[in-house]
Every structure is written in C-alpha cells, then in structure tokens.
C-alpha cells in the first residue's frame, strides 16, 4: 500500500493529520513501518518481531519512503527503500542439534537511495545515489567515487562494515561505519545534505509512539517525547506525564 503524509493545506504553525480505518485496515502496520524507519535511520538493530510480520507466503517485505528536503537553494526529493526478511541467526549459536532450536533475526538488505532536485536555476532528474544490491560496498561506481573516493582500503573497510551491519540487523547506509567514512571523504555539500538530513530526521525529528505504550497508559501515565536545543546541540528523550494529576516540567 501507499500513504501520503504531506499536509497540503495552508502552512499552519501546528497541524494534525489523522488516519482513520476499520479494524484490520492497516493503521498499526503504518506505525510499525515508521518504527522500522526510525530504527534504520538511527543506525539501530531491527528487532525480530518486525521480520515476523512478513507474510508467510512471501520471502521478504519491501519498504519505500519518500522525503522532501527543502533548503533556500532548492528541494531534494529523496526515495529510500530496503528489503526486510527473517533469516537464521548464526551469531548466537555454533551448533544446532534440534531443528526447533534454530534462532532467527531480522535482516535489512537491498538498500537504495534515489534523488531528484529542483531549484529556480537547475533541475536534476531522478537518479540513483546509493544501491547496495551488489557484491561491492555499493553502486553506481560514479557516485561511489564522488562519495568515498578511489582508495581501495576504503572499499575494503566498507565491505566489512556492510557485512557487520547485515549480521546485526542494521542498515549499512546509516551505520556508524559508513557515515564516518562518508563524512571524511565526501566533499560535496549537495550529497552531504541528502544523507545528513535523513540521519538528523531519524534521530531528532521522527517520534513514534507504538502500541507498547498502552501498558504505560494503563498505569496512569503517558510517555512524552521531546526535543530541545542547548549549547549548539540537539537532545531528545521522553518523560512520564501523569494522566491523573497536574504535571510540573
């Protein structure tokens, strides 16, 4: 399915976009998809529970997200997609005698970042920036050289990081190893804005309240997620808000 979360009305200072539907219509599936997105953009492992949601008749699920990154210079339209599947976890076992004792994990693979760009003076049609569906670190080669350079040692380091990310149910594109190399080598502000904007969004601007919070509500408090800036840095977190009494923050 596809859902557009863009507010097409006037640019209010604050607005609410609602999603309504019958039981079983997929409302919770949307929240789960956003939860996976936040984990991936934040460089965290995706729990097995999300891979368990993949249809039994399907080998994997493909998730696609489209972002609009606006700056005074112009607008990047960015598409980020990846596949999610359930696979055997060999990291926590080296011998299995009972087939029922096999452990599983999530796996993120076939990541792809595409972009287009529009400004008053320039239009760039949609093209691929990063595609991990290759034995190398990522393709296409022209973009690899722009983002990372030509040092073969960097290629080796990224291939190792790619395998480590796969083995720990994390994104390779948003792993700390890839981002560190990207920040060291990429001199293009144009491409840096794309990747760094997605990283910032996942860490500091995307907040997801899942059904697991229902237990907190039943206990009389609601987790309040927040973001604030101090000393040039951005911090996020959550604090419990009582549903029965006045709160002082």
Where are these regions (language model features)?
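Short, flexible loop/turn elements at secondary-structure junctions
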Residues: 23, 67-71, 84-88
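A short, structural micro-pattern
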Residues: 59, 76, 105-107
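AAA+/P-loop NTPase substrate/partner-engagement loops
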Residues: 49-71
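Pre-Walker A-like glycine/lysine-rich segment at the N-terminus of P-loop NTPase domains
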Residues: 1-35
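Short, surface-exposed coil-to-beta transition loops
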Residues: 75-81
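Extracellular structured ligand-interaction cores
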Residues: 16, 60-64, 79
């Amino acid at each position: 399915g596809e859902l557009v979360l863009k507010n097409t009305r006037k640019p209010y200072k604050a607005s609410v976009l609602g999603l309504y539907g019958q039981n079983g219509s997929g409302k919770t599936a949307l929240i789960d998809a956003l939860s996976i997105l936040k984990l991936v953009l934040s460089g965290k492992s995706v729990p097995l529970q999300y891979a368990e949601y993949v249809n039994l008749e399907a080998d994997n699920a493909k998730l696609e997200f489209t972002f609009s990154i606006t700056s005074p210079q112009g607008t990047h339209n960015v598409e980020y997609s990846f596949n999610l599947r359930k696979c055997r976890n060999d990291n926590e076992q080296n011998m299995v005698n009972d087939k029922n004792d096999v452990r599983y994990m999530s796996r993120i693979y076939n990541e792809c970042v595409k972009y287009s760009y529009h400004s008053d003076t320039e239009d760039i049609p949609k093209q691929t920036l990063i595609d991990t569906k290759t034995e190398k670190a990522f393709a296409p080669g022209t973009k690899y050289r722009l983002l990372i350079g030509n040092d073969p040692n960097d290629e080796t380091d990224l291939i190792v990081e790619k395998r480590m990310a796969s083995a720990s149910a994390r994104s390779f594109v948003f792993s700390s190893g890839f981002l560190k190399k990207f920040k060291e080598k990429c001199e293009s502000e144009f491409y840096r804005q794309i990747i760094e904007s997605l990283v910032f969004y996942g860490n500091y601007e995307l907040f997801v309240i899942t059904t697991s919070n229902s237990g907190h509500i039943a206990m009389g408090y609601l987790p309040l997620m927040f973001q604030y800036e101090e000393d040039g840095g951005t911090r996020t977190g959550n604090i419990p808000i009582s549903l029965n009494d006045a709160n002082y923050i």
